[in-house]
Amino acid sequence: MLKQAESMLKWAIEKDNYTTSEKIGLNDYRHVHESLGIGFIALEDIKEDEKLVSFKKDSVLCLTNSDLAQLPEVQSLPSWAALLLVMATENASPNSFWRPYLSIFPTKERITSPFYWDENKKDALLRGTVLESNEDCNEITQLWIDRIEPIIKLYPNRFSQVSYEDFLRMSAVMLAYSFDIEKTKSPISNENEKSAAETSIKEDKNGDAAKKNEGSANQDDEKLHSQSLVGNNCEVNSEDEFSDLESEVDPDELEKAMCPISDMFNGDDELCNIRLYDINGTLTMIATRDIKKGEQLWNTYGELDNSELFRKYGFTKKKGTPHDFVLIKKEHWLPEYIEKLGFEEVEARLELLCREELLYNLEGDFTFSKADLTFKEICLAFVLMEKEKELISVPSKSDIKPKHYRKLLKIIEKRINMYPKISDPKNFDEENAKTLIEGEIDILQNLSAKVKEALTKNRPKKKQKVDH
């Protein structure tokens, strides 16, 4: 594994115009934890602000750098979907320029995220968690049917070797290793703008796609720690991957890309000592503090909670993260009100809660995090749903009664009982699921304690006997 990663590093430097500092080198960290795989180590002391890796934007795998950018049907895809097709197309070509990079992508068996889990496994290990309804794999399957297959049929010579199975695998890889980088005008796209929209591409005789397509090489197939782009004109965000998450990234300004070498750094938001910056069009990894010889170099994955770490990168942090949260979903509290008021009336009242910023989604889900265990909003929702007449304003805090606190306590108790019991994890999947579950239960128990405290304070005092 280390040898393969070293070969890729050599290729990136010699063939893809990457430069690296002599002060860093690859190291096998599997003895520390299997999820770490291969990472970078400081071979000498490194000073803050030292440049460690640099490369141009034409050295990354993305649609702009691919000859697939000439296809209007591919251009019309979301950035992440276009990147997937580029990756799968390159991987289908034995002579691809990106072969050394593609060869170190994790195999399906080495992907430790729950991307490939079937419904039975999800129910057994993730029931009740934030990830219980995750549909990443199903969404990719639907994308394949609705958007990718028609493109393949339209250009059979170009895409005949692209398989659904490999497209799925590239999805899991991209989820863990992609960056959002600022778009640049490529000769290909400029040419495309001048030509008619129907212009098609001729198949390369040797089957190679242009040098710049995608890849998301993980330093070694097993490393599922994150990589992120931060700094001038760059985004850390890779949360627009699938439709369950709305991206804050402007598709006209940024695009999804795979960056060899940069995605070989393990990531930890707390240990982070390097960052990737865009400096006048050159992407550069810079030390954010002094680093001692022998230290591992850590990129950052941003402010993610444990469920997102597991979903994207296939690992969890034992002690959780400051961003962990739990959901009380509509199905945990709304059914009785729908039965009583009807769906349309409940929906109207949810809209009212949203307008008053007491609820932040029309689905009716409430979020509670480590940092914010405020429960006034859900209690006001109970009060609002109990009203028989149509309302034009939400109730006030004074309308919250002890019965509403007791109702919330019952819901919390039911939520805690929903989780699977994993007392003795037998593998990495069970280990991660157990960590996720314990973190959510901890938040719910803390929430319960705060509600009980409020209930005690608001309990009516018994009338005292007055002796005459």
Curated annotation (Swiss-Prot):
Q: Known Pfam families for this protein? A: SET
Q: Where is the SET domain?
A: 22-302
Species source reads Schizosaccharomyces pombe (strain 972 / ATCC 24843)
Similarity comment: Belongs to the class V-like SAM-binding methyltransferase superfamily. Histone-lysine methyltransferase family. SETD6 subfamily.
InterPro entries on file: N-lys_methylase_SETD6, SET_dom, SET_dom_sf, SETD3_SETD6_MTase, SETD6_SET
Protein name, UniProt field: Ribosomal lysine N-methyltransferase 4
Q: Name one GO biological process term.
A: negative regulation of cytoplasmic translational initiation in response to stress
| UniProt KW keywords | Methyltransferase, Nucleus, S-adenosyl-L-methionine, Transferase
Q: What does this protein do?
A: S-adenosyl-L-methionine-dependent protein-lysine N-methyltransferase that monomethylates 60S ribosomal protein L42 (rpl42) at 'Lys-55'.
Highest taxon listed in the record's lineage = Eukaryota
Show the stretches that span the lipid bilayer: none
Q: Where is this region: Disordered?
A: 188-225
